[in-house]
């Protein structure tokens, strides 16, 4: 399942991750995989108001993976596709597995 959610980007020089954002969480963390939607759940403390959740997502990914991100799709949706710039698929999968799944 994780190989369907995480894939190499052809034009962004990074790794694409399909995520579902759960805002207003107690802490920022990687959650489980939503198998029905085929998305990795990311829990974020910020509310989705005025782009605050998207900024929090960028900070969280920078802290977790040490890489910058681009929100490729879903800027105003809880379902997003994120590109982790300069990362490898194995690197991302290893860090996700170590963090929670």
Curated annotation (Swiss-Prot):
Domain of life (superkingdom): Archaea
Signal sequence interval, chain numbering: none
SUPFAM superfamilies in the record: YggU-like (SSF69786)
Pfam families in UniProt: DUF167 (PF02594)
A GO CC term assigned to this protein in UniProt: cytoplasm
PANTHER family: UPF0235 PROTEIN C15ORF40 (PTHR13420:SF7)
Family membership noted in the UniProt record: Belongs to the UPF0235 family.
HAMAP family per UniProt: UPF0235
Protein name as it appears in the record: UPF0235 protein Maeo_0841
């Amino acid at each position: 399942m994780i190989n369907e959610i995480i894939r190499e980007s052809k034009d962004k020089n990074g790794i694409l991750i399909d995520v579902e954002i759960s805002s207003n969480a107690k802490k920022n963390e990687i959650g489980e995989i939503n198998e029905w939607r085929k998305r990795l759940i990311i829990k974020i403390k910020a509310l989705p108001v005025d782009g605050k959740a998207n900024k929090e997502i960028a900070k969280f990914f920078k802290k977790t993976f040490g890489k910058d991100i681009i929100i490729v799709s879903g800027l105003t949706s809880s379902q997003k596709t994120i590109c982790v710039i300069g990362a490898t698929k194995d690197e991302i999968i290893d860090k996700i597995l170590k963090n929670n799944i």
